[in-house]
């Protein structure tokens, strides 16, 4: 067991990234355009370009006069992120990008193409302060929160990649298409960067020209169980999918595997999840990384099924995740027979349960592997 790291909820104070158009809601966009002395209709033009046409370079916004392009480029469209490394696997169907921000901070996103959907896994923080010992991100500590624009730029870049992608050596499923799903399951605890994440979600789900127009049902916000923030998220009425990273049904083990459990116990996290389900009518996803001889015992499967059925009834689904290897970890995934028995026992308690498809393990792009190295 690695030496436990402290929980960190408040990101270290660092200089803020430069203001970007994507940081601004409709009211702030109108104010920013007015500050530049431009007519009000330019705000909608810019939003249509960014959210509707996925254009972040004003020089490509040919419906704007050249002088206006120069003006907004300097004031509203600074270069925020640089892709410093891109790695692919699965014949191009899984692609990990290492991003570097203007202050040198690094973080990662992962684009995954499936036959029926295209999903981008995005980061909400550089690093993570939740200190889960089986997660490479958590063991790296928290550098800082990402800005709303830094979050949204990951989404826009993925949408552009899908729209423009083609070429030899690329599987047919990896060619072209439209971004359909967003999961806040990259680096960081989304609910610890609450205001910026919520602002990003609002822009993701709003129809163009105010946002990317992704269905709220296709957006998943993950959390290790910040119970008050889960309730707050429910009250936003955004109706996104909530994914609770549980990983153990009992406090004794979860106190170690998910250190935030020392603040909010399993019962408190499940009560908050039930509140979310009641308010939104949405089924809650439970994430459970299955670790050999740690949390895969039959009695824990029974307890998990019992507690989830009691707390959430039919409004729950368990995603069992075979543990992905991380550097220096002494743990590994449960054997397949143990995995199958675990799933069977959870289902026996009346709870929907499946094993999640693991993508990107070979390029350290799978759940728990993102470390922004290099």
UniProtKB/Swiss-Prot annotation:
Entry binding sites for S-adenosyl-L-methionine: 188-189, 222, 245-247, 324
Cellular component terms (Gene Ontology): cytoplasm
Binding of [4Fe-4S] cluster, residues: 128, 132, 135
Coiled-coil boundaries: none
GO biological process, one term: tRNA methylation
Cofactor: record remark: Binds 1 [4Fe-4S] cluster. The cluster is coordinated with 3 cysteines and an exchangeable S-adenosyl-L-methionine.
One term of GO molecular function: rRNA binding
Subcellular location: Cytoplasm
Domain Radical SAM core positions: 114-361
Active site: 108, 367
Catalytic activity: adenosine(2503) in 23S rRNA + 2 reduced [2Fe-2S]-[ferredoxin] + 2 S-adenosyl-L-methionine = 2-methyladenosine(2503) in 23S rRNA + 5'-deoxyadenosine + L-methionine + 2 oxidized [2Fe-2S]-[ferredoxin] + S-adenosyl-L-homocysteine; adenosine(37) in tRNA + 2 reduced [2Fe-2S]-[ferredoxin] + 2 S-adenosyl-L-methionine = 2-methyladenosine(37) in tRNA + 5'-deoxyadenosine + L-methionine + 2 oxidized [2Fe-2S]-[ferredoxin] + S-adenosyl-L-homocysteine
Additional facts recorded: Reaction proceeds by a ping-pong mechanism involving intermediate methylation of a conserved cysteine residue.
Protein's recorded name: Probable dual-specificity RNA methyltransferase RlmN
Lineage: Bacteria, Bacillati, Actinomycetota, Actinomycetes, Mycobacteriales
Gene: rlmN
């Amino acid at each position: 067991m690695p030496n436990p790291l402290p929980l960190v909820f408040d990101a270290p104070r660092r200089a803020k990234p430069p203001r970007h158009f994507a940081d601004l809601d409709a009211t702030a966009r109108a104010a920013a355009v007015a500050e530049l002395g431009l007519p009000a209709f330019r705000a909608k033009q810019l939003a249509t370009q960014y959210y509707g046409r996925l254009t972040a370079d004003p020089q490509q916004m040919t419906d704007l006069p050249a002088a206006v392009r120069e003006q907004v480029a300097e004031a509203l469209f600074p270069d925020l992120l640089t892709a410093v490394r891109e790695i692919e696997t699965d014949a191009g169907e899984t692609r990990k990008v290492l991003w570097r921000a203007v202050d040198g901070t690094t973080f990662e996103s992962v684009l995954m193409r499936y036959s029926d959907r295209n999903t981008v896994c995005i980061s909400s923080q550089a690093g993570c302060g939740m200190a889960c010992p089986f997660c490479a991100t958590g063991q790296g500590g928290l550098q800082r929160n990402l800005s709303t624009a830094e979050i949204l730029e990951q989404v826009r870049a993925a949408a552009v990649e899908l729209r423009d992608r083609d070429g030899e050596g690329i599987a047919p499923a990896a060619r072209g298409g439209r971004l359909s799903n967003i999961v806040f399951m990259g680096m960081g605890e989304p609910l610890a960067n609450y205001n910026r994440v919520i602002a990003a979600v609002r822009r993701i789900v709003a129809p163009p020209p105010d946002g990317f127009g992704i269905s709220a049902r296709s957006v998943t916000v993950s959390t290790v169980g910040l119970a008050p923030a889960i309730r707050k998220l429910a009250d936003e009425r955004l109706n996104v999918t909530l994914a609770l990273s549980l990983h153990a049904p009992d406090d004794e083990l979860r106190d170690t595997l998910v250190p935030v459990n020392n603040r909010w116990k399993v019962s408190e996290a499940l009560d908050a999840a039930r509140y979310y389900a009641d308010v939104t009518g949405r089924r809650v996803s439970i994430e459970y990384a299955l670790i050999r001889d740690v949390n895969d015992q039959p009695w824990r499967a029974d307890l998990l099924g019992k507690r989830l059925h009691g707390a959430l009834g039919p409004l729950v689904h368990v995603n069992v995740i075979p543990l992905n290897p991380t550097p220096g970890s002494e743990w590994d995934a449960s054997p397949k027979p143990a995995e199958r028995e675990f799933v069977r026992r959870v289902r026996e308690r009346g709870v929907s349960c499946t094993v999640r498809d693991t993508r990107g393990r070979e390029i350290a792009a799978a759940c728990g592997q993102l470390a922004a190295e290099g």
